[in-house]
């Protein structure tokens, strides 16, 4: 084997290793990437069915229903334009309330019910996740209590 052939062989092996490494990294990102959708986007069928994503908005008033087992909770998440029914089995955060901001992670079933595996509640009256605030602002339903939070988020950018 000539030195030139050896160099080409090493170069080909290095490129193959880089290609495999890049493919593994991209696959890991794709598997762990979780998008955020508002109820309006879910209603417009922009959200994937049977794939994990985050759903954010407000818990609709009068929508919280606990089932007989004490662990399963059904509620509705809204951006005041559209609503998505949510089913969650587990302990809810202490700050989970009707009319408050919530971000749920889970999957959308074919029947339109979002099955959450994790529910996060807004932790104080001035904070709302940027994605949820933007979705509510886009729907034209930003309430006066959120105005300060959204202004603070704009200043941080």
UniProtKB/Swiss-Prot annotation:
Where does the protein principally reside? membrane
Gene designation per UniProt:
ccmE
Q: Where in the cell is it found?
A: Cell inner membrane
What's one GO MF term for it?
Answer: metal ion binding
Q: Which SUPFAM superfamilies match?
A: Heme chaperone CcmE
Name the family.
Answer: Belongs to the CcmE/CycJ family.
Q: What is this protein called?
A: Cytochrome c-type biogenesis protein CcmE
Q: Where does heme bind?
A: 123, 127
Role played: Heme chaperone required for the biogenesis of c-type cytochromes. Transiently binds heme delivered by CcmC and transfers the heme to apo-cytochromes in a process facilitated by CcmF and CcmH.
Q: Which residues lie on this side of the membrane: Cytoplasmic?
A: 1-7
What is one GO cellular-component annotation here? plasma membrane
Biological process GO annotation list? Answer: cytochrome complex assembly
> What's a Pfam family this protein contains?
CcmE
**Record InterPro entries:** CcmE, CcmE-like_sf, NA-bd_OB-fold
Q: List keywords of the entry alphabetically.
A: Cell inner membrane, Cell membrane, Cytochrome c-type biogenesis, Heme, Iron, Membrane, Metal-binding, Signal-anchor, Transmembrane, Transmembrane helix
Membrane topology of the entry: Single-pass type II membrane protein
On the Periplasmic side, which residues?
29-157
Does Oxidoreductase appear among the keywords? no
Q: Which Gene3D superfamilies match?
A: Nucleic acid-binding proteins
Coiled-coil residue windows: none
Identify the taxonomic lineage of the organism of origin: Bacteria, Pseudomonadati, Pseudomonadota, Betaproteobacteria, Burkholderiales
